[in-house]
A protein has these predicted regions:
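N-terminal periplasmic "start-of-domain" segments of outer-membrane beta-barrel proteins
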Residues: 38-70, 95-98, 126, 184
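Face-selective signature of the C-terminal outer-membrane beta-barrel domain
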Residues: 285-301, 340, 344-508, 515, ...
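Transmembrane beta-barrel wall of Gram-negative outer-membrane proteins
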Residues: 196-308, 352-357, 361, 470, ...
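Surface-exposed extracellular loop regions of Gram-negative outer-membrane beta-barrel proteins
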Residues: 438-449, 496-507, 518, 532, ...
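Outer-membrane beta-barrel signature, preferentially recognizing the C-terminal barrel domain
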Residues: 341-355, 360, 461-469, 516-525, ...
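Extracytoplasmic beta-strand/coil segments of soluble accessory domains associated
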Residues: 76-123
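Gram-negative outer-membrane beta-barrel transporters
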Residues: 182, 482-486, 593, 599-603, ...
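Short acidic/polar hinge/loop motifs at secondary-structure boundaries
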Residues: 119-153
């Protein structure tokens, strides 16, 4: 460990904080055979895994913890200090924010699941960091009652997508009339390459709720207005051709190297985004009887976003340059003016999403309980307009393309129940359920003569298809002895992909439609866990689980296009087959927690994006392919302690090491001479991650929080040829510190101020991430 800390200077202060919160004295394990499992606590304080007796390592955040410790503008902010969780939110208001876990990366959105009150927020129409990103915006931070993150595929109630993690967001329902209003402002100071500016954001929300007799309701509205830093940079490969004397001379380009180490010129910034979002949500709950409750949720979200480009290039007169004809002179070398011009574009997005859920569940404490929940998510409107004409004229007019995902959506149905053996000596609690879902992706792109206001023209490309899954599952929690509990379960799933269709337009304008074949698969995933309650404080749990993660519609049928508009769909992808295990030793007291977990995961046919050469295409193309085998193993240390040294000081921390490797990849084709993938690190999984949070509450009014997040660098390619992480499209290691101060003025008013990235770490995770950001918050509770 000393060597590791010496090589990671930023990790030293965080490791010290983590070790401090783990410093509670270790007790010798008692040898009593009469120890029993902990008593059941009040329902409202228990995690989802405790309530359902899932044998899964779980970490949680409550509403009070979020309010005290997190500068939260959107709900995904609440997860930032949980162990081994990274939500790739590039800016406030980002709609492409997938979640990474301890063994899965930020481009693998379908390897984790996000629910809010049983409603699926994960967009399982794809497995990427774009149109596969979760629908976080359907939950407001003020709604949160608690958030639980469950690690690993050890609960039969969840599909194989859970092998990364499951995030369960539980929202509040009022017991009496309540109302609140909050406004949060943020201002980011950003400076990188040729961009130096401030980017503000404002979020305002109003919440109303009440309970009258058997009916309770909650209504909330949220408005977000946000400006982003550059999301992309515009680069061109370094030219080896000397410029002629007649070529116009341009200044402002910045020499750098790309992630493989080749020289490039950075010419500008792209996708500086202004987004305006509104969310409205209604929740109703009605007690049909003392033992039965019906609930309905309706959510609506709309987004209007505009993105533009910035040029660093200037002419000899100082005017900005966006491309043209012929060649130009940059630092003495010749570059194509039209090639430069093709880098600049603008786009606008108009989205409206609807979410509905209907549930019926028992609330009695009898031997049998059950629940039925149906959900539907629909993209009522999802248009993205992009310019293709010359810049900057394209900012106000000109040709372009319109991508329309308006017919995308999904429907889920779950029926589940639990039978609990009652009476003295009861040994079993059996849970069971059935699941069905359908996912639909529609993503046609049309040409248009007016990208801003024009109608759709000729079809340019299309990707569409459907998947359907049916599943049956069961789990038995068996108390073998007073201090020993086994959980045995399994899940059978049947999957089908159908109605796949692709359309592509060649460089000559010829269209190529392809009807893709139907594919299907099925399988059984056993689960086994054993928990030993050694003492009242100490427990040990060993878990094993198999998981099947079936391909999404996007992985099967999504077009892959280069500048030559080439389509490469692969409807014959195989499901990921996961074998995972974890051994967790945990100590819990009234004021502390310590957990050490050893985990290992073997994935066969891992679905990973690779790059290769394809006949007929002059440049390498990225596509999804099954990698034969990957293996991830590691150790995780998590601790929490209240009243450390002084009353009111609480420390939380986590430290994780993961050795993630590709162990077999027969389909690999090297694009760099001498490169290989076997033995290289699994893409997007860092070697080290850590978090540390120190919160001091001297009284009931004030709270002060200082927190830190650390990650080592990671690789994005299967052959690890991206040797330069500190550049656009690279993946750097980082340490960032955050600060928050909150004051409760009285029973109605509270205020908070904070700073994210206090140390102003300038880092890139493919995209440039936010630099130092200031926050201010004011809230009124009725």
């Amino acid at each position: 460990m000393k060597k590791v800390l010496d090589n990671h200077g930023a990790l030293r202060p965080m490791a010290a904080a983590i070790l401090a919160c783990l410093a509670a004295p270790l007790q010798v394990l008692a040898q009593s055979s009469e120890q029993t499992l902990p008593a059941v606590t009040v329902e409202g304080t228990r995690s989802v895994s405790d309530r359902n007796q899932y044998p899964v390592t779980t970490e949680s955040m409550t509403a009070d913890q979020v309010a005290d410790t997190v500068n939260a503008v959107t709900v995904e902010d609440a997860l930032k200090y949980l162990p081994n969780v990274l939500v790739r939110r590039r800016f406030i208001g980002d709609t492409q924010a997938p979640m990474a876990t301890r063994t899965t990366g930020i481009n693998a959105s379908a390897r984790s699941l996000i629910f809010a009150d049983g409603i699926l927020l994960s967009t399982l129409v794809n497995n990427n960091n774009q149109n596969g990103s979760p629908q976080w915006f359907m939950v407001a931070p003020d709604e949160i009652d608690r958030i639980d993150v469950l690690y690993g595929p050890f609960a039969a109630a969840y599909p194989g997508n859970s092998y990364g993690a499951v995030t369960e967001i539980v929202t509040r329902m009022p017991r009496q009339f309540e109302a609140s209003a909050k406004i949060t402002t943020a201002n980011q100071q950003f400076s990188q390459y040729g961009t130096r500016d401030h980017y503000p954001s404002t979020q305002a929300s109003v919440n109303l709720g009440n309970r009258a007799g058997d009916l309770s309701w909650w209504f909330s509205v949220n408005h977000l207005n946000s400006f982003s830093q550059p999301v992309t940079y515009l680069t061109i490969n370094q030219s080896a051709t000397a410029a002629t004397g007649s070529a116009p001379v341009l200044a402002g380009a910045i020499a750098d190297r790309n992630r493989t180490g080749a020289p490039i010129q950075v010419l500008g910034a792209g996708n500086l985004t202004h987004t305006v979002q509104d969310t409205a949500k209604l929740k109703l709950a009605y007690d049909v009887s003392p033992a039965l409750t019906a609930a309905y949720t309706l959510g609506y979200w709309q987004n209007n976003a505009d993105a533009s480009s910035q040029s660093y290039l200037t002419t000899t007169t100082g005017a900005p340059y966006f491309g043209g004809t012929g060649s130009v002179n940059i630092a003495g070398n010749a570059y194509s003016a039209s090639g430069i011009g093709s880098l600049f574009s603008s786009n606008s997005t108009d989205q409206a999403h609807w979410m509905q859920a209907l549930s019926l569940k028992t609330t009695n404490s009898g031997p049998l309980s059950w629940e039925v929940i149906a959900t539907h998510f629909n993209y009522g409107n999802a248009l993205t307009r992009t310019s293709t004409g010359p810049y900057p004229l394209a900012q106000s007019a000109g040709p372009g393309r319109i991508a329309d995902a308006s017919d995308t959506g999904w429907t889920t149905l779950d029926v589940k129940g639990t039978w609990r053996q009652k009476g003295r000596g009861a040994q079993h609690s059996v849970s069971f359920g059935a699941h069905a879902d359908q996912y639909k992706l529609a993503n046609p792109t049309y040409s248009t003569s007016d990208w801003i206001n024009g109608d759709k023209g000729a079809l340019f490309s299309d990707s569409r298809g459907k998947t359907r899954t049916e599943a049956l599952w069961a789990q038995d929690v068996w108390r073998i002895a007073p201090d020993l509990m086994a959980t045995i379960g399994g899940r059978y799933e049947r999957w089908r992909a159908y109605d796949g269709f692709n359309f592509a337009t060649s460089g000559s304008g010829t269209g190529f439609p392809v009807n893709q074949p139907e594919v299907s698969d099925s399988g059984f995933s056993p689960k086994l866990s054993l928990t030993w309650q050694a003492t009242n404080d100490w427990s040990m749990t060993g878990s094993f689980g198999k998981a099947l993660r079936f391909p999404t519609v996007g992985e099967l049928y999504q077009n892959v296009q280069t500048g030559q508009s080439f389509t490469q769909a692969n409807p014959f992808l195989k499901p990921e087959k996961v074998l995972a295990g974890e051994l967790a030793l945990e100590r819990r007291t009234s004021d502390s927690k310590l957990r050490v977990s050893l985990f290992e995961e073997h994935v066969s046919d891992a679905l990973i994006s690779q790059t290769s050469s394809i006949p007929g295409v002059a440049v390498p193309v990225s596509f999804v392919q099954n990698v034969d085998k990957t293996r991830q193993r590691g150790i995780e240390l998590v601790g929490q302690k209240k009243d450390v040294l002084i009353k009111g000081l609480e420390l939380n921390g986590s430290l994780t090491y993961v050795d993630a490797r590709i162990t077999a990849n027969a389909g690999y084709v090297a694009t760099t001479p001498g490169a290989a993938s076997v033995g290289k690190r699994t893409p997007y999984v860092p070697e080290w991650r850590a978090t540390a949070v120190a919160t001091y509450k001297p009284d009931e009014k004030w709270s002060y929080t200082l927190a830190g997040r650390y990650s080592s660098r990671l690789y994005a390619t299967v052959d690890n040829t991206d040797i330069n992480p500190a550049t656009y499209q690279g993946f750097e290691g980082y340490f960032v510190a955050d600060l928050r101060i909150r004051y409760q003025l009285d029973r109605h008013w509270s205020a908070a101020a904070g700073i994210d990235n206090l140390n102003n770490r300038k880092y890139i995770l493919f995209h440039p991430f936010p630099q130092r950001t200031l926050y201010a918050e004011l809230k009124y509770d009725f």
